[in-house]
């Protein structure tokens, strides 16, 4: 501010800058809201897929249990598969990145189900149902993998940060230098930073501060194989 000539701070110049920054602030608010909505939508989709996966695993176990005791090996395989998937997607070692690529247990389960020899129509129906559920489980698991990426182009976030930088520069251009103004600008900056952090966290649902809980899949271990 001290570097600019005095005529840059007359009333007309201030009015034009305020109008321009008002337009930029409006666009920034709109884009920021869209980014939050997009990230939240992606997060909720992944969360619902985890819940759906948990329900289908339990349903598959119940179908296999109704088939008969000859499915005990498949049910144990299913339980072990769930335990491994939990460890791969939510590793106890936080230094490890989540592995969202589905493991190979489903292929083994398909083979084991194929080897079943139904003795009546009821078992044939249950075998076909087990195949269908296992296919749905694999489809959901691959959906989790392909949807793991960013729900929006990162260029959007770069543009928003650039606009916010311009807005805060305009605030500092005409604001008096006192503790109240500085504190206010800091609070505003922290609020905007929190919004951007929320976007980034929601965009990585299996790691970070705001991550999807594995509790639903862990709950399946209380049922599967029992």
State each model region's role.
Residues 1-36:
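N-terminal juxtamembrane/topogenic regions of multi-pass membrane proteins
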Residues 4-16, 52, 122, 129, ...:
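Juxtamembrane loop-helix boundary motifs flanking transmembrane segments in multi-pass membrane proteins
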Residues 46, 59-149:
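Structured inter-helical modules in multipass membrane proteins
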Residues 39, 63, 171-174:
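Helix-loop junctions at the membrane interface of multi-pass solute transporters
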Residues 30-51, 203:
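Transmembrane signal-anchor/signal-peptide helices with a preference for the extracytoplasmic
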Residues 1-4, 14-16, 146-226:
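Alpha-helical transmembrane anchor segments
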């Amino acid at each position: 501010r001290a570097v600019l000539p005095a005529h840059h701070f007359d009333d007309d110049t201030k009015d034009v800058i305020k109008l321009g920054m008002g337009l930029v602030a409006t666009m920034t608010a709109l884009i920021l809201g869209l980014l939050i909505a997009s990230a939240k939508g992606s997060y909720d989709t992944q969360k619902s897929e985890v819940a759906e996966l948990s329900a289908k695993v339990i349903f598959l176990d119940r179908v296999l249990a109704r088939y008969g005791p000859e499915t005990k090996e498949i049910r144990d395989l299913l339980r072990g598969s769930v335990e491994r998937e939990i460890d791969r997607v939510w590793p106890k070692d936080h230094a490890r990145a989540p592995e969202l690529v589905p493991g190979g247990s489903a292929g083994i389960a398909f083979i084991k189900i194929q080897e079943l020899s139904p003795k009546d129509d009821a078992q044939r129906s249950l075998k076909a149902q087990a195949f269908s559920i296992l296919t749905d489980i694999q489809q959901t698991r691959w959906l989790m993998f392909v949807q793991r990426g960013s729900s929006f182009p990162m260029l959007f976030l770069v543009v928003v940060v650039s606009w916010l930088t311009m807005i805060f520069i305009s605030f500092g251009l005409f604001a008096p230098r006192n503790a109240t103004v500085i504190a206010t600008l800091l609070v505003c900056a922290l609020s905007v930073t929190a919004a951007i952090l929320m976007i980034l966290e929601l965009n990585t649902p299996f790691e970070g501060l705001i991550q999807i809980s594995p509790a639903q899949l862990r709950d399946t271990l209380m049922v599967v194989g029992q």
